[in-house]
Amino acid sequence: MSSDELKRQAAAAALEHVRDGMKLGLGTGSTAKHFVELLGERVRGGLNVVGVPTSEVTRADALRCGIALTTLDEVDRLDLTVDGADEINAALNLIKGGGGALLREKIVAAASDRMIVIADESKLVANLGRFPLPIEVNSFGLAATLRAIEEACAECGVFGPLSLRKGSDGHAFVTDGGHWIVDAQLGRIPDAPSLADQLNAIPGVVENGLFIGLASMAVLAGPNGIRIIERP
């Protein structure tokens, strides 16, 4: 079974938690796209929900699938967000942002009563950090911000090269919010909550891809079926 088929299975399992009338956060990435497509099928069958997309790509996908959209300016809270992840540990802390939407993803997740993370089981890891950690930064004063990121990482006992993410045109990748992304190849992050706090204390850092304490459940698909992990 292909990775893409497993992603779709995880998305289908998460869809079982959606109820009529819900306000949903719609994630970004290949697994979240499966969820949006499957949700669209349910909407066409009569399900009544509204969604808040976490990126312009997801917005376009949701509209194409016939899902009604709203914004966090128009609703106070969301009932549920369903999103993918680049890495998940047993405590349901995550690395996200491989698709470049980490800021909006974190804003939407924080505004939700529950967050379900969907992935194929290869994303479950003992320790976060093998996947490069995305850090969204302001373009102004980049060199100073990079030095501060290196210092923050060192204080948390993690080291590794930093690279500015490039787009397909060879120039700096620009997020929906107009920022740049630095990818930190750290290998292993022993204390993710501390590193997240240290990074977000840097003036040039807009947000980081460590999602701490936001996910309430992970739905993981593997060759032997669906595995559910709930936050302790």
Curated annotation (Swiss-Prot):
| Pathway recorded for this protein | Carbohydrate degradation; pentose phosphate pathway; D-ribose 5-phosphate from D-ribulose 5-phosphate (non-oxidative stage): step 1/1
Q: Which CDD domains match?
A: RPI_A
Reactions catalysed according to its record: aldehydo-D-ribose 5-phosphate = D-ribulose 5-phosphate
- Whether Oxidoreductase counts among this entry's keywords is no
- Cite the Gene3D superfamilies for this sequence: 3.30.70.260, 3.40.50.1360
**So where does substrate get bound?**
T28, G29, S30, T31, D83, G84, A85, D86, K96, G97, G98, G99, K123
Q: Name one GO molecular function term.
A: ribose-5-phosphate isomerase activity
Q: Which GO terms describe its biological process?
A: pentose-phosphate shunt, non-oxidative branch
Q: Which residues form the active site?
A: E105
Q: Keywords in UniProt for this one?
A: Isomerase
EC number(s) for this protein?
5.3.1.6
Q: Which InterPro entries match?
A: NagB/RpiA_transferase-like (IPR037171), Ribose-5P_isomerase (IPR050262), Ribose5P_isomerase_typA_subgr (IPR020672), Ribose5P_isomerase_type_A (IPR004788)
Report quaternary structure and partners: Homodimer.
Which protein family is it in? Belongs to the ribose 5-phosphate isomerase family.
Q: What does this protein do?
A: Catalyzes the reversible conversion of ribose-5-phosphate to ribulose 5-phosphate.
Q: Which HAMAP family would you find in this protein's record?
A: Rib_5P_isom_A (MF_00170)
Question: Any idea what this protein is called?
Answer: Ribose-5-phosphate isomerase A
Source organism? Rhodopseudomonas palustris (strain BisB18)
Please state the gene responsible for encoding this protein: rpiA
